[in-house]
Design a protein with these regions (language model features):
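Residues within well-ordered beta-strands of beta-sheet-rich folds
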Residues: 26, 97-99, 285-289
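Short beta-strand segments of immunoglobulin-like
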Residues: 83-89, 275-277, 342-348
Length: 425
């Protein structure tokens, strides 16, 4: 939406899941539609002299190729000061990450760090500069951070190395190994992290890692039959299942742990592929075989189970239902929805129309309202879970007489509900 200086653009409200009225803005480049950092353009209106703070770093030994402090497991260490004096040891290939936040006087908000730099012996091996993110790379941010750790702790470690399939242009590796540090000499390696904001406020953290030669256990052998590769087209097939993951959708090669659940009377087997959340960069295609005939194949779809049920779409062809998926950690099966959406609890008072509208299966596609035959807008109030029409903003004349209202709800499988009533306004 183009806006101009002095133009009235929004009214703050508090109908969402928020603590106070506020306005969300995204800055995009009009030429590329990249997300861009608003502070690059607004810093003349903001005062910020507060330095970012790093809380801890994480070491990521490469499986089969590196050790950190004698272990192949990832490990975190707190920054009790800006210059850590404890001894760390490493051998082979190790990646690093950092948990850091930025702050600003006059605000209680916790902000992201604009620039993060990792140096080894004075040479920059990795740098991230959060100035822009291409729209098509948005989900790659999951791979830049330690996504698995975030899911468990809600702490965001920014990795100072790039996964093989991560092409975020804001990540800059100064080494041929994507920012992975190679400890191949028995000596002291001097590491330094610098975190800075867009105003130039920065803080530097240092620690020393001693290269200590030691035997590195071999990497666990992986099942080639269960592998998906980040740099090629993948076709994963089992009886009753076809999964197609295109090149460029994975941050790294991943070994699936496929599981199938057979339920009596179900339309298909239920398939899962990974033991925890693993988001793809974009949509992959999944096809499941239908076990028995249904009255209306257009009502079939694929449902994913991952905390909440989600409709993954679906088209039926030659005994298979094909939908889409972008989460390896969910489970998938065929579902059938020929039940219309629910319209209930209609009320008219205080110049407002309210109605409860929902669909517990494929999901609500649309809700349209008409007063005296003319379309009126019903807005969803998230906190209350109802749809509301403010009559003073609608093309409805206040006559003190009866008006007719018609509501039409349609779900994602084309099932339709119609509600009609009268109200005085």
């Amino acid at each position: 939406f183009p806006v101009a200086k002095g133009q009235f653009i929004a009214v703050s409200g508090n109908t969402g899941a928020s603590k106070a009225p506020h306005l969300h803005l995204e800055f995009h480049s009009t030429k590329t539609w990249d997300f861009i950092d608003p502070l690059d353009y607004l810093k003349g209106f903001v005062t910020d002299t507060t330095k970012p703070i790093a809380h801890s770093f994480m070491a990521y030994p490469v499986e089969g190729e590196g050790l950190f402090c004698g272990s192949q497991r990832k490990q975190s260490y707190g920054f009790t000061s800006t210059d850590l004096v404890r001894e760390f040891t490493a051998w082979g290939k190790v990646g690093f990450g950092i948990w850091a936040n930025d702050y600003m006087e006059g605000s209680y908000g916790i902000l992201g760090v604009h620039r993060t730099t990792l140096e080894v012996d004075g040479v920059t091996v990795f740098e991230s500069v959060v100035d822009s993110i291409p729209d098509h790379c948005n989900r790659m941010v999951n791979s830049w951070g330690d996504y698995d750790h975030y899911c468990r702790t809600h702490l965001w470690y920014m990795k100072s190395f790039a996964d093989p399939g991560n092409t975020l242009p804001m990540l800059h590796a100064g080494t041929v190994d994507r920012g992975i540090v190679s400890f191949d000499e028995e000596r002291d390696y001097h590491l330094a992290y610098t975190v800075s904001d867009v105003f130039g406020n920065s803080r530097r953290y240092t620690f020393t890692v001693k290269g200590r030669r030691q035997s590195i256990p071999k990497a666990r052998r992986r099942s080639v039959m269960n592998m998906l590769w980040h740099d090629r087209m993948n076709s994963f097939q089992r009886p009753g299942l076809m999964l197609f993951v295109a090149k460029g959708l994975l941050p790294d090669d991943v070994e699936l742990s496929p599981r199938v659940k057979v339920k009596p009377g179900a339309l298909s087997a239920e398939w899962s592929f990974y033991g925890k959340s693993y988001p793809l960069f974009d949509w992959a295609k999944i096809s499941l075989r239908l076990k028995h005939k249904v009255k209306d194949p257009s009502k079939l779809y694929i449902v994913s189970h991952c905390g909440v049920d989600r409709n993954m779409g679906g088209t039926f062809n030659d005994g298979w239902v094909t939908g889409r998926m972008r989460e390896l950690g969910a489970s998938y099966e065929i579902a059938y929805d020929d039940t219309p959406p629910v319209l209930s609890a209609f009320s008219a008072s205080g110049g407002r129309l309210r109605v409860l509208a929902y669909d517990k299966q494929s999901g609500l596609r649309s809700l349209k309202g008409y007063v005296d035959g003319r379309f009126v807008l019903f807005e969803y109030m998230e906190k209350a879970g109802v749809y509301v029409c403010n009559l003073k903003d609608a093309p409805v004349s206040k006559t003190g007489k009866e008006h007719s209202v018609k509501l039409v709800a349609v779900d994602e499988r084309g099932n339709r509900s119609v509600f009609t009533s009268q109200f005085e306004y």
